[in-house]
Amino acid sequence: MEAGDIFPNYTGASIINLPASVCRWLAVQPFGAPPLAHDWLSNIPGQYDQVVLLLIDGLGYDFLTRIVAGDFSGVRGLEFWGDRFDECPLLPLTSVSPSTTCAALSSLWTAAPPLQHGMLAYEMWLKEFGILSNMISFSPASARSQTGGLKHSGFDPQRFLPLPTFGDHLSGQGVETIVLQHTSIARSDLSLMLSARSEVYAFRAGSDLWLSLAEILAQPKGGKRFIYVYWGALDELMHFYGPEDERVLLELSAFTLQMRYFLDKLPKQGKKPLMLITADHGQIHTPKQPAYDLRNHPQMANCLTIMPSGESRLPFLFVRPRREDRLRDYVEKTWGKSFPMAAAETVLTSGLMGVLSVDHPHRERLGDWVVFP
């Protein structure tokens, strides 16, 4: 962690500032972190009866600006993004750290940075259950094909977060909250954790998503609505094939054409809903390299009490007593400046993941050292 590093802007330019902004557009009481900074809010004036937030997992700002600039002009349909942003603002936001999906979505739904809601990473040490857990499947991190295994140890997804969720808040304000997610995750533990007090619609394909959304918007309203749409297919393909693989571009093209069909069919008269499009994070190409595989570094593994948690691009290290100097020397000699390390206490007070006291229970999930590959 050095001068010049880019931190999430939790005070007005992060995804955690979206809930309070949505509250402002719906004209209800704010929730959690402050709304987006005035420069951002001024681009979207007015108040609305319905707000739609579409989250496209993995569609980061850099990738989107390249699409808008025409870098992928050979892929039919993507020109829509450049055409649309002639009339709609494109505003850069920071995610959270770490920007992995479970941490970022938890921040979005609690309007709080990761240290406060406790979902710190994709894989996390949970002392209360005595396990290194995958925080998407909520099973042991080593159980590759299992989902929900943590429930056998008493885990309750609806009681795990220490903070209220956005759905809780909106329900108390008389706002109906609707969540549209793919059927494969619509009632997963992570979805149950985040979508409390929400009516969940499970879609099976992009066509199902857009037609269902159109039907929901056309339903008579008894009050105000917040509609959250999560689309994860792009991120899944990026993880398997890389962020600019042709499959990724074709999937986004098909999704864009269906979205365009939906937008063209919206009623031209009457009060229109506000539609926001955001992401939880972007992606960069990170090829597998044997030099970074911990199985090839037994000397480093011998310095640890458990295997690294966190995620590949932000590992948390739990170090055996009297092995810290040996660990740091090994990392420095093996990878040099490409793997800087910071003590967990430094991260706790830096603001990178929010701020937390060193004696808070969430502190134990961070380990002793954090690596920044």
Residue ranges and their predicted role:
Residues M1-P373:
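Feature captures the catalytic ectodomains and active-site-proximal regions of enzymes
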